[in-house]
């Protein structure tokens, strides 16, 4: 959520910056609502003051032995007007909040301006794609040949965009997650967390999935217990462990010396992939359920840009140790996620597609999520909104795809990257 004071005082500037994201802010409508809010709020306060004054006069008149019936009638009338004014004000504030909740974060000054992914800017690249001396096979062919990727049973059990992994491929998938967690906790200073996979609506609001992106979620509910008995408690499966990790800061005030707080978690992620019909229908690239190792940082508001570069480096280190070629892209304003002020995408080389594909997004959300969550840090004795950052470190399934394709051998076997062999019991090849 953007700063309401900024929106009120600099609405034209905000509209111009949001326009670079493709978001059209109706300045006239927002200004009209704001004027109406001020009028209604002023009217409500005047009625409250008038009611209090008349109520006081009733007591004084009664002490003098005067007839207070006319005064009571006036207070009743004022109360009716006040109640009507409060209802109108509450409805207006709800409307304003609904509009505010749909406004994305302001892009940073260093974010490339552009409409979509075609305007993303390459920042750097690492490694050289391997030159194969034999026909390249994709991860589906290689995984099925190794009897480790079973889409048939995935469809039977759940439907399209689900998979069953078996044997050494399942073990490699697990090894990748363990390797990533060890790297981030032992070398990068993150604290490993195990988080709930079901979260409540407040959590999804805090990190920006609700209300705008409800169609992307898998939702469920259970019968309440204790005080909630007889009520249905709403939950959603997490689209990323960013949601529970970041929301642990909700309604908290940290001391300055407690920051930065760096957390990581390995979890499944569940996404409906609404709007992705027909895209990546084969293989492991776009699934309804996939695993990811997530990184989250809660930082001092003056240090979030430094933290963004650091976090991108942490994600890159995974790819470097696995010796997978990649490039780093600065996303254009029109391609960024809702909460981000600036995002780097890491794209790994996939030989079978002869292109780079996204494997991580690392974003600085500035105070956008913190304002929704009221996550604050005490600076010079005064609570201020902290800054939140999140990034994949990495998407485990897509990393598995990259390893399978980049490490394929002419005989169909898959070599195990040196960094993973200790996690695979010394195994050097699959197949």
UniProtKB/Swiss-Prot annotation:
Write out the pathway annotation from the protein's UniProt entry.
Aminoacyl-tRNA biosynthesis; selenocysteinyl-tRNA(Sec) biosynthesis; L-seryl-tRNA(Sec) from L-serine and tRNA(Sec): step 1/1
- Positions binding ATP in this chain are 271-273, 358-361
What is catalysed by this protein?
A: tRNA(Ser) + L-serine + ATP = L-seryl-tRNA(Ser) + AMP + diphosphate + H(+); tRNA(Sec) + L-serine + ATP = L-seryl-tRNA(Sec) + AMP + diphosphate + H(+)
How is this protein named in the record?
Answer: Serine--tRNA ligase
| Gene Ontology MF annotations | ATP binding; serine-tRNA ligase activity
Ranges for region Disordered: 41-66
Give the family this protein belongs to, as stated in its UniProt record. Answer: Belongs to the class-II aminoacyl-tRNA synthetase family. Type-1 seryl-tRNA synthetase subfamily.
Q: Which NCBIfam families match?
A: serS
Q: What does this protein do?
A: Catalyzes the attachment of serine to tRNA(Ser). Is also able to aminoacylate tRNA(Sec) with serine, to form the misacylated tRNA L-seryl-tRNA(Sec), which will be further converted into selenocysteinyl-tRNA(Sec).
What InterPro entries does UniProt report for this protein, alphabetically? aa-tRNA-synt_IIb, aa-tRNA-synth_II, aa-tRNA-synth_II/BPL/LPL, Ser-tRNA-ligase_type_1, Ser-tRNA-synth_1_N, SerRS_1_N_sf, SerRS_core, tRNA-bd_arm
This protein's record includes keyword Ligase = yes
Which GO terms fall under biological process for this protein? selenocysteine biosynthetic process; seryl-tRNA aminoacylation
First-level EC class: ligase
State where it is primarily located: cytoplasm
Q: What is known of its domains?
A: Consists of two distinct domains, a catalytic core and a N-terminal extension that is involved in tRNA binding.
């Amino acid at each position: 959520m953007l700063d309401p004071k900024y929106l009120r005082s600099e609405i034209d500037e905000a509209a111009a910056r949001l326009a670079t994201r493709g978001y059209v802010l109706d300045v006239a409508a927002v200004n009209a609502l704001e004027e109406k809010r001020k009028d209604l709020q002023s009217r409500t306060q005047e009625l409250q003051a008038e009611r209090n004054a008349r109520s006081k006069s009733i007591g004084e008149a009664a002490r003098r032995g005067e007839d207070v019936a006319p005064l009571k009638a006036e207070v009743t009338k004022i109360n009716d007007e006040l109640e009507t004014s409060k209802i109108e004000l509450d409805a207006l504030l709800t409307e304003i909040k609904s509009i505010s909740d749909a406004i994305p974060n302001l892009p940073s000054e260093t974010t490339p301006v552009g409409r979509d992914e075609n305007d993303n800017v390459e920042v750097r690249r690492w490694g050289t794609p391997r030159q194969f001396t034999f026909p390249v096979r994709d991860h589906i062919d290689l995984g099925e040949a190794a009897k480790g990727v079973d889409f048939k049973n995935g469809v039977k059990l759940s439907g399209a965009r689900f998979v069953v992994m078996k044997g050494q491929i399942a073990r490699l998938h697990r090894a990748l997650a363990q390797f990533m967690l060890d790297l981030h906790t032992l070398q990068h200073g993150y604290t490993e967390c195990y988080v709930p996979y079901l979260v409540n609506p407040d959590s999804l609001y805090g990190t920006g999935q609700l209300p705008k992106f409800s169609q992307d979620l898998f939702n469920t509910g259970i019968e309440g217990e204790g005080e909630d008995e007889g009520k249905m408690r709403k939950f959603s499966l997490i689209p990323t462990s960013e949601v529970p990790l970041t929301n642990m800061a909700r309604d908290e005030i940290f001391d300055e010396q407690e920051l930065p707080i760096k957390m990581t978690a390995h979890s499944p992620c569940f996404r409906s992939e609404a709007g992705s019909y027909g895209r990546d229908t084969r293989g492991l690239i776009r699934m309804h359920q996939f695993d990811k190792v997530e990184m989250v940082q809660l930082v001092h508001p003056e240090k979030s840009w430094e933290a963004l570069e650091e976090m991108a480096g942490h994600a890159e280190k995974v790819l470097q140790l696995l010796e997978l070629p990649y490039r780093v892209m600065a996303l254009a304003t029109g391609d960024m996620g809702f909460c981000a002020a600036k995002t780097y995408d890491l794209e790994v080389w996939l030989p079978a597609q002869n292109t780079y594909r996204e494997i991580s997004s690392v974003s600085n959300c500035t105070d956008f999520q913190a304002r929704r969550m009221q996550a604050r840090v005490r600076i010079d004795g005064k609570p201020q909104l902290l800054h939140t950052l999140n990034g994949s470190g990495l998407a485990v399934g897509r990393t598995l795809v990259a390893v399978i394709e980049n490490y394929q051998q002419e005989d169909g076997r898959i070599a195990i990257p040196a960094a993973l062999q200790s996690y695979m019991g010394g195994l050097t090849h699959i197949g």
